Amino acid sequence: MHRCVGGVCVSLIVCAFLTETLGMVIAAKEKRGWTLNSAGYLLGPHAIDSHRSLSDKHGLAGKREMPLDEDFKTGALRIADEDVVHTIIDFLSYLKLKEIGALDSLPSSLTSEEISQP
């Protein structure tokens, strides 16, 4: 009985050792400290580029406080994007109708004479 308990304990220790050496850790290690990416995000590009501290900058100026580009402030970009999306949807609808043969029964396009006649 004592041999079985001892064998189980030894096998558990060996399994734990193998998983640790192969990189398969059971519990993830806690990450600590600052990385360049986290410092750059929190402090902003000005602090990283010129190596100034927070006291020199008088506060945080991270990405959250940076002004947006002017392209994104205007609504013209959004309208243009919506027009492109509508054009693509219309084209795909046309292709689908053409595929199922629904366009064959429609008359051909109108000529300029037919448009000018009331």
From Swiss-Prot:
It comes from the Eukaryota. GO terms for cellular component: extracellular space; neuronal cell body; secretory granule. Residues 20-30 form a propeptide. GO terms for biological process: neuropeptide signaling pathway; positive regulation of transcription by RNA polymerase II; response to light stimulus; response to salt stress; sleep. It is found in: Secreted. Residues 1-19 form the signal peptide. The keyword Transcription does not apply. The modification Alanine amide is found at A61. It holds the Pfam family GMAP. Coiled coil: none annotated. GO terms for molecular function: galanin receptor activity; galanin receptor binding; neuropeptide hormone activity; type 1 galanin receptor binding; type 2 galanin receptor binding; type 3 galanin receptor binding. Strongly expressed in brain and stomach, moderately in the eye, and very weakly in heart, kidney and gills. Not detected in liver. The keyword Zinc does not apply. Keywords: Amidation, Cleavage on pair of basic residues, Hormone, Neuropeptide, Secreted, Signal. Belongs to the galanin family. Endocrine hormone of the central and peripheral nervous systems that binds and activates the G protein-coupled receptors GALR1 (galr1a and galr1b) and GALR2 (galr2a and galr2b). This small neuropeptide may regulate diverse physiologic functions including contraction of smooth muscle of the gastrointestinal and genitourinary tract, growth hormone and insulin release and adrenal secretion. This is Galanin peptides.
